Amino acid sequence: MKLDTQQISHLLSRQMYHLAPRKKLLIWGGSLGFVLLLLIVASSHQRIRSTILHRTPISTLPVISQEVITADYHPTLLTGFIPTDSDDSDCADFSPSGVIYSTDKLVLHDSLKDIRDSLLKTQYKDLVTLEDEEKMNIDDILKRWYTLSGSSVWIPGMKAHLVVSRVMYLGTNGRSDPLVSFVRVQLFDPDFNELKDIALKFSDKPDGTVIFPYILPVDIPREGSRWLGPEDAKIAVNPETPDDPIVIFNMQNSVNRAMYGFYPFRPENKQVLFSIKDEEPRKKEKNWTPFFVPGSPTTVNFVYDLQKLTILKCSIITGICEKEFVSGDDGQNHGIGIFRGGSNLVPFPTSFTDKDVWVGFPKTHMESCGCSSHIYRPYLMVLVRKGDFYYKAFVSTPLDFGIDVRSWESAESTSCQTAKNVLAVNSISNWDLLDDGLDKDYMTITLSEADVVNSVLRVRGIAKFVDNLTMDDGSTTLSTSNKIDECATTGSKQYCQRYGELH
């Protein structure tokens, strides 16, 4: 039977399927212009869960499933600050507040043994084996391994959440001094049940098929004897090419610790090194916050500096970046401050006529405040572009979503009286509206707790809160005022003092 264009589009947009061994089915024509095939590879050790006769889909659920809608949501007070051109104003004069709602966290699990076993079959084997391990039992060996910093993005063509996490191998070193890091890639259905033994073929080359879960095949420079490999991996996707995600990370090379991008579903030219045009590379580049500007399918933007707002625009082909926007005097030294990169930025789920709006969760790093030498917490930031001008339309005080954060030293404790106390939002996987409008928005975020626990939770109410903000003043006078950062810094210190009193 000959299919017309509409029928072909319908078939290609259908979700992926579990298939019986040695069967394959054309399932998805991606935006890259190549066709993806889904295969399930037979294994003598594992059973395939579904049969081709039933063609059971991976999921019949949309990204907002009934489970997401009917989950228990708990209120969280959201307070923060909007811009002002008056440095003499009191912080309370421009401090809107509201209520958002979040679910309990859902912890994502992975097997350290499976991770180690898979790495021993790769080109990285020599990086993860020390001689003393020949006489060690497997339980003691696995104490040298950690997973952390899970980051997720929803891939519409796969109808699944694609999650990347950092894997650290310490060797005989301490937890803060790993020998090497890798990027683990997992696949989850809309309700975050892991999907295993899914093989995805995206080219006919020898390395053109991946089987989930797997280790991202990053080209790792062998520079030095520790801190090798990709660190702080984040995943993001351009809404205009929604099935072509990019993994962003920093990695040491022969020159510096630089920022890289990696496209896992491209048949070639997967890895790109980012550099700023006409500038000498800094010794250490990290914490770049990715986002995408409408109408720019061949570029990725980064918030390069959150204190002195600096925006980069980078080619995804060459990796060359230009400074698209710098607030204030480019030569002015604002200092590092407490603000660090966290999640990706995602666009507001409905469009504005005169501006572009993004939302994300950077993090604060507060030293010797409250209860710990170093406290990290996420905060909500709204970034706006009007014409060529960018500004922060809202910066919240720190958020913890009602979580008693796990102790840095013990899984059995939530004590904050330790060297570090860490909660960070690593990604916004999706942010979608039901037909009812802004009152029914659902956001999925991934969290990292104590740098050992990866989890996800759902958040409601951010769309309505952002829509109610005053974002009409794109005046360039706002670019020279640090008042919003000063007030957010004060609010952050007040938060950690209160948290310390309770923990």
UniProtKB/Swiss-Prot annotation:
Lipid bilayer topology: Single-pass type II membrane protein
Main enzyme class: transferase
Residue positions with a glycan: 468
BP term (GO), one: cell wall organization
One Gene Ontology MF term: mannosyltransferase activity
Chain ranges passing through the membrane: 25-45
Localization terms from the record: Membrane
EC number assigned by the record: 2.4.1.-
Changes seen on gene knockout: Leads to a size reduction of glycans resistant to alpha-mannosidase treatment.
Pfam families to which the protein is assigned, alphabetical: BMT
Example of a GO cellular component annotation carried by this entry: membrane
First and last residue of the signal peptide: none
Keyword entries, A-Z: Cell wall biogenesis/degradation, Glycoprotein, Glycosyltransferase, Membrane, Signal-anchor, Transferase, Transmembrane, Transmembrane helix
Extracellular topology ranges: 46-503
Residue ranges that the UniProt entry lists as topological domain Cytoplasmic: 1-24
Presence of keyword Amino-acid biosynthesis: no
Family under the similarity heading: Belongs to the BMT family.
Annotated function: Beta-mannosyltransferase involved in cell wall biosynthesis. Responsible for addition of a hexose to the beta-mannose chain. Beta-mannosylation catalyzed by BMT4 masks beta-mannose epitopes recognized by monoclonal antibody (mAb) 5B2 reacting with beta-1,2-linked mannobiose as a minimal epitope.
Full protein name: Beta-mannosyltransferase 4
Originating organism: Komagataella phaffii (strain GS115 / ATCC 20864) (Yeast)
